[in-house]
From Swiss-Prot:
The protein's name in its UniProt record: Zinc finger protein 280D
Residue numbers bearing the Phosphoserine modification: S104, S545, S908, S911
One annotated GO biological process: regulation of DNA-templated transcription
Region (Disordered): 89-119, 157-236, 523-608, 739-809, 896-979
Organism: Homo sapiens
Length: 979
């Protein structure tokens, strides 16, 4: 026994709880119903901690065949579905195997004297049922490998052929004398069928037996036997396992309830097959050892539970409650309870005591230091569920092993210590009872104490009771979070509520002696023992046990030469599992190439499943954009490869680009990149609104979780995403300078217009009387100053005015070129004209314009054209302009045209900036245009500026054909049209 790889170590234990229930502690539902035919009639239920390097100290031990290690098993190990062998002894066994796995299976307890011979894996229905299928076993075969994958579905042994296996060397089965429970006519050269094979995966949930695919050429199917028909008629039903999490169930109803929340999409196909197999099994009372298998349960299923209590609804009273402390009246009981909690928080804030900084605001526990309190809040009172938190106590533990030890020492299966005293609703979680009270007993007289769950119906006693809990003489329950005012209340609570209230559903129908393994989580242990290849849920190896009953021990424990080095290798490569304090193992497991291939294959299978599901996804044609990364989705399978958890924070996503952006933004070394992604998509994100189409609920980007919660609560509601473009205004230096120029430009604009308009009136007289060269020279000298002044006015308003404004300035400057040097001096004298005189002058102008309209038919045609356009952008064809120019005989028009084509004109540069150049109008065109506008709008125009300009222009109009006057009038009329 020195070379035994399964030799127990003192400190190597897995993070599974192995608890032997004593006889006096057994609940009524745990007691035995019938005696087992064995030497020891003491077979309790085991809820146990399995050691990875030592056998379970129990009455049930599994046998392992030394010659048939399977290297091709994935996702767990064989369950009890094939066969089981139990040995009622507590001694340790050695393994003289010829080909052991590198990392020894945890639950294997092989027999030291097992024969190196051929095996038959075959189900059976009765003890002593012997078949002849061992005759087809070839003695020359070396080893059989079974690849049990999850893709093949459930166990099909009840209707399928029997699998045969051949050992390493040629030998036969030599059985011991069977016990009294055996049939007497046992052929010693034929193998005795056993009942189950223990799993090799202690931390991963054991799957049910799948239909094996033969991976070796030496695998042979036993044909010509009648075991299939007998098995389907008289066999015991095999334990079923959940196809997703592989938790075993002996009955169909608990499996249904489990699959409803675990994998509802697979329940129809699974239960359809399960019903067919269960209906074919009639004899369920056969007392055989296959009933004593291994059941794996989680802590949540074994220890926690809920009970609805009295379903009858309580009558609503709508009672008001008055707080005698602040004399405030609350409308219902829930608001009064919240008010009292608010009072308590205010009193704690006002009294700066050390207890306020060390008391948890959630469970009201006191801690030595504020740092420990903060650690407690972050690890326990978190929205994320961790496998190291006890929901009953609301405490977090270092490892899963410590949690399981705590559950064993302090809690019972199906314990529900938190009770609603109104309707007897019970739960293992305090938050469930509190939420139940606030929803079911709202608008009643009942007031719930958050410290001891006592219900009081009057406000004043409730407040006194509430304040008594703040005193130091309180009695805390050591097994939950409740605290009581008297010791008697605490003791009554412990005796009445800290015991099994409802048996877990998974334990219904289990025979006595069933070994139940409790685990804190489904997958590999994260904080407990170091994971080995046999622990991983993706791939593991398992050795099939020899077909023997529990009282048959094979002889010929001969070892082959190849078994010794393999045994040494297995012993050396077997890792030491972690100690209870969570320390890591000293040796790393050596993973064989076969196991690496299996893990790679398993991961590729999982990925292919996801990609296949997404590739087959039906979606509408068109462009699909991801809400998270705002990019186009070309391939759903590649864009959403898997569900990723950030290792630094609580960020989770399925979008690959969003995960990369998150890591670069928040967890990269260069924080400058943090804002690049924000700037790119912040404008789009700010304009997103989610609207529920069935109700009035809506939310923005910050309330996406609220919309998801709303849609999950209301299954029939649908959501619509409304996207609006929101301009993000970032003030720059250019914008600020424009804003500063905008105000003075608007003030300068009317002043410059008023200055220009009286200049036009003065220039009319100057231009009509002076035609000599001296006037032309004076006007050329004055031209530069006028252009400079007008250019300043136009440049200040250039950014705010439209293109037509620059044209107006251009025309104004062209009119200024015809004036003399005295125009600037006379501009200020005509600004303050009286409004009464202006009205009279407007009427006079109207009469003159009507007379001029009647004089020429050409002007009437032109006025009809202007009426059609009625805007400052009216233009004339070159032919009409040519005809109009020929009809005019005024010399000033030639000067006007000559000045317009001069390259030195500054105003021409200003007009070029507007990219639109208007042709100059003749005097007749201007007069007709002005008359038309006055007739259309009447003399009562509200524009005061236009009235002033017209009055100034009509003071000194000699003949009405001055080009400078007409140009200024056109510009003013254009401005009035724009206004």
């Amino acid at each position: 026994m020195g070379d035994n790889p399964f030799q127990p170590k003192s400190n190597s234990k897995m993070a599974e709880l192995f608890m032997e229930c004593e006889e006096e502690e057994l609940e009524p539902w745990q007691k035995k119903v019938k005696e087992v035919e064995d030497d020891d009639d003491d077979e309790p239920i085991f809820v146990g901690e399995i050691s990875s390097s030592k056998p379970a100290i129990s009455n049930i031990l599994n046998r392992v065949n030394p010659s048939s290690y399977s290297r091709g098993l994935k996702n767990g190990a064989l369950s009890r579905g094939i066969t089981a062998a139990f040995k009622p002894t507590s001694q340790h066994y050695t393994n003289p195997t010829s080909n052991p796995v590198p990392a020894s299976p945890i639950n294997f307890h092989p027999e030291s004297r097992s024969s190196d011979s051929s095996v038959i894996v075959q189900p059976f229905s009765k003890p002593g049922y012997i078949t002849n299928s061992s005759r087809v076993v070839s003695n020359k075969s070396s080893e059989l490998l079974f690849d049990l994958t999850q893709d093949t579905g459930l166990s099909h042994y009840q209707g399928g052929p029997t699998l045969s296996m051949a050992g390493m060397s040629e030998s036969s089965f030599l059985s011991k004398r069977p016990s009294t429970s055996e049939v007497n006519n046992v052929n010693p050269k034929k193998p005795k069928p056993s009942e189950s094979v223990s799993g090799a995966n202690s931390s991963a949930v054991l799957p049910s037996v799948k239909s094996p695919s033969v991976t070796s050429s030496q695998a042979m199917l036993a044909k010509g036997t009648n075991t299939s028909s007998n098995q389907s008629k008289n066999g015991t039903p095999f334990p079923r396992a959940c196809p997703k999490c592989n938790i075993h169930f002996n009955l169909l109803d608990p499996l249904k309830n489990h699959m409803k929340y675990c994998c509802p999409d697979m329940i129809n196909n699974f239960l359809g097959l399960a019903k067919t197999e269960f209906s074919s099994t009639v004899n369920k009372n056969t007392t055989i050892d296959s009933e004593k298998g291994k059941l794996i349960m989680l802590v949540n299923d074994f220890y926690y539970g809920k009970h609805e209590g009295d379903v009858q609804e309580e009558q609503k009273t709508h009672t008001t409650f008055k707080c005698f402390s602040c004399l405030k009246i609350l409308k219902n009981n829930i608001r009064f309870m919240n008010h009292m909690k608010h009072h308590l928080e205010l009193e704690k804030q006002s009294s700066e005591s050390w207890e306020n900084h060390t008391t948890c605001q959630h469970c009201y526990r006191q801690f030595p230091t504020p740092f420990q309190l903060q650690c407690h809040i972050e690890s326990t009172h978190t929205p994320h569920e961790f496998s190291t938190i006890c929901k009953i106590c609301e405490l977090s533990f270092e490892t899963e092993h410590v949690l399981l030890q705590h559950m064993k020492d302090n809690h019972k299966p199906g314990e529900m210590p938190y009770v609603c005293q109104v309707c007897n609703y019970r739960s293992s979680s305090f938050s469930d009872v509190e939420t139940h009270f606030r929803t079911s007993h709202e608008n009643t007289k009942n007031l719930l104490c958050p410290f001891c769950l006592k219900v009081i119906k009057i406000a004043t006693p409730y407040m006194h009771h509430y304040m008594k809990h703040q005193k130091k003489g309180i009695h805390r329950c050591t097994k939950c979070r409740l605290q009581f005012l008297t010791c008697k209340e605490k003791m009554d609570h412990k005796t009445q509520h800290h015991r099994t209230f409802i048996k877990p559903k998974q334990l219904e129908g289990l025979p006595p002696g069933t070994k139940v393994t409790i685990r804190a989580s489904v997958g590999p242990l994260q904080s407990g023992a170091s994971p080995t290849p046999s622990i991983s849920a993706s791939a593991s190896t398992l050795q099939l046990s020899p077909p023997r009953t529990k009282n048959i021990t094979a002889k010929n424990p001969a070892k082959s030469n190849t078994s010794k080095p393999n045994t040494v290798k297995s012993n050396a490569s077997k890792p030491n599992t972690s100690k209870p304090n969570g320390s890591k193992s000293k040796y790393k497991p050596k993973i064989s190439n076969m196991q690496k291939k299996q893990s790679t294959l398993a991961s590729s299978n999982k990925k292919s499943k996801v990609n296949t599901a997404l590739r087959n996804l039906r979606y509408r044609r068109g462009i699909h954009k991801c809400i998270e990364c705002c990019s186009e989705i070309k391939d759903f399978a590649n864009h959403f490869p898997t569900y990723v958890h950030c290792s630094f924070c609580r960020y989770n996503t399925s979008c690959s680009k969003a995960y990369v952006n998150h890591m670069m933004s928040f967890h990269s070394n260069r924080p400058s990149k943090r804002f690049c992604i924000f700037k790119k998509h912040s404008e789009n994100l700010r304009g997103i609104t989610l609207v529920c189409l069935n109700c009035d609920f809506l939310s923005d980007v910050s309330g996406l979780d609220n919309m998801a919660t709303h849609l999950s609560q209301h299954k029939t509601h649908t959501c619509q995403v409304v996207m609006q473009k929101v301009s993000v205004c970032i003030p720059t230096s250019e914008h600020l300078s424009e804003l500063k120029k905008e105000a003075p430009a608007k003030e300068q604009e009317p002043v410059s217009k008023e200055i220009a308009r009286p200049n036009m009136a003065e220039r009319e007289t100057e231009t009509s009387n002076s035609e000599s060269k001296q006037d032309k020279a004076a006007s050329s000298k004055e031209k530069n100053g006028c252009n400079a002044n007008s250019f300043e006015g136009s440049s200040t308003t250039k950014s705010e005015e439209s293109i037509t404004v620059s044209d107006k300035e251009n025309e104004t400057c062209l009119a200024d070129q015809e004036t003399g040097s005295k125009n600037i001096v006379s501009c200020d004298s005509n600004i303050g004209a009286d409004k009464v005189e202006k009205k009279k002058q407007i009427q006079h102008v109207c009469q003159e314009m009507e007379l001029k309209m009647c004089q020429s038919s050409e002007n009437i045609i032109l006025s009809d054209q202007i009426k059609d356009h009625n805007s400052s952008e009216a233009r004339f064809s070159s032919k009409n302009i040519k005809d109009l120019r020929l009809a005019s005989d005024n010399v000033s028009i030639d000067q006007f045209l000559r000045k317009r084509h001069e390259p030195e004109s500054v105003s021409s540069d200003v007009s070029e900036q507007g990219s639109i150049h208007l042709e100059p109008l003749t005097p007749s065109e201007v007069l007709e245009y002005e008359a038309t506008e006055i007739l259309q709008k009447g003399s009562g125009d509200p524009s005061a500026k236009t009235d002033e300009v017209v009055s100034d222009q009509t003071d000194d109009i000699p003949g009405g054909n001055n080009p400078s006057t007409t140009e200024a009038t056109v510009d003013l009329e254009d401005e009035k049209e724009r206004s």
